[in-house]
Amino acid sequence: MKIDDIKDLKIEYRDKLDINPKTTIGMEIEFQNAKLKQVNKKLKRNLDTNWIAKYDATVCRSILGIMHGGEINSPILRNSEKTWEDLQIVCNILTKNKAEITEKCGGHIHIGKQLLNEDSYMNFIKLWYIYEPIIYRFSYGEFNRERESIFSYAASVRNIFRVLIMHEYNYKNSFDIVQYLSSRRKLGVNFQNIYSKETIEFRCPNSSLDPVIWQNNVNFFAHLLDKANNVEIDEEKIQYLLRCHTDKHKNVADYTKIDLNNANELANIVFDNEIDKLYFLRQYIKNGEEKRSIDFTKSKKFTK
């Protein structure tokens, strides 16, 4: 598939996703500029579920004594029509209250750990190790590059995963792997919540006010975990990457480069549905721009 084949495709919002029915979901929507108290008031008035806006030091600031910005935490969600209707309402509330997504704002997604079998953690780690540059570029959503805060709050895990893979014989079960990974939280994928909240947290996505982006992100990460249970890992590719690995591979700033071959490869591993594949690739390529811009700017709109 070429960029020209999908550059005019628009990603549509769906009533429900075709994901494992065991999937549980959590979202953390960081935003700036909207009045925090006002957003919370609107959430309580318009929703019968427990979406809460709270203070977050990364994005909040006081203007004339009024707190602006914050983070909206969802309740534990399922893949239902109501979940996606509620997400639309939340995004509309933020938009109407003049919220903005800046390069300080992350859009973290929690997926219940039950999707990943106990003996599949190393499979997941290998998949992420191979395709991290693809995953990061996809997770930038409608923005052309990573947010500024990603280096501090959602750093690359490629070097950490490399050590695990090289010493795989020492990490035979999920407990050993989680013990090794749980010392740090502020990574692109965070295992620290595995036992306390029973979730795997994906911290690399930029935040968004577009529910289509959120839904597409959830769809990818849920499928990624689910597919790690039965994927056949390309061990030759792993060994090649281990041999060629240098410090530049941990530089997230280089992940704006488009690698359509690897993106296609990942889409074919993760998705069985052609629409899912196309929507993943469309968000990955954005407007086809590879040069990392100085400004944190949006791509030409590719959602309906």
Where are these regions (language model features)?
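Helical (often loop-to-helix) elements that flank the catalytic cores of nucleotide-handling enzymes
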Residues: 80-90, 114-140, 210-225, 289, ...
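Histidine-centered divalent-metal-coordination microenvironment in nucleic-acid enzymes
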Residues: 100-116, 199-203
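Acidic, glycine-enriched catalytic cores built around paired aspartates
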Residues: 283-304
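Long, repeat-rich segments with strong aromatic
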Residues: 195-200, 204-233
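A common structural junction motif
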Residues: 46-52, 94-101, 132-135, 222-232
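Aromatic/basic-lined ligand-recognition segments
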Residues: 24-28, 119-208
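Flexible helix-coil linker/hinge segments at domain or subdomain boundaries
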Residues: 100, 133-148, 227-283, 288-290
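Terminal catalytic/cofactor-binding subdomain
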Residues: 1-97
